Swiss-Prot record:
Superkingdom as given in the UniProt entry: Bacteria
Source species taxonomy: Bacteria, Pseudomonadati, Pseudomonadota, Betaproteobacteria, Nitrosomonadales
Cited Gene3D superfamilies: MazG-like (1.10.287.1080)
Name of this protein: Phosphoribosyl-ATP pyrophosphatase
EC number of this enzyme: 3.6.1.31
GO terms for MF: ATP binding; phosphoribosyl-ATP diphosphatase activity
Similarity comment: Belongs to the PRA-PH family.
Presence of keyword Nucleotide-binding: yes
Signal sequence interval, chain numbering: none
GO CC field: cytoplasm
Subcellular location: Cytoplasm
A Pfam entry, by short name: PRA-PH
Reactions the enzyme catalyzes: 1-(5-phospho-beta-D-ribosyl)-ATP + H2O = 1-(5-phospho-beta-D-ribosyl)-5'-AMP + diphosphate + H(+)
Amino acid sequence: MSDPDILFRLAETIEARKQSDPHASYVAKLLHDGRDKILKKIAEESAEVLLASKDGDSTHVVRETADLWFHCLVLLAHHNLKLGDVLDELRRREGVSGIDEKAARKAGLADNGIGRMNQDK
């Protein structure tokens, strides 16, 4: 059975691991190694999702997507963002045509967070 709260519990665990010893915690090590290491893991996991999909292996797609989501949650923690921030953005987009939403972003009418991301460099 699906448990939608698992993402919140996982995000809380990741947040708690920020204070852990990087030698004892994979999450703490990723956060200690910095954004570029986290981004490298996200790129790697994204590629693995693509390959699993091309192979038509549904079980592998699920497992690799879980890895990708996990590393995206680590990236959010790195930027001191919360899962709720992403959910709020999805909620904001709900019911809006993808074409209209993309046009609004191109026109600069929607905050896409790029300015905020660049502040963390």
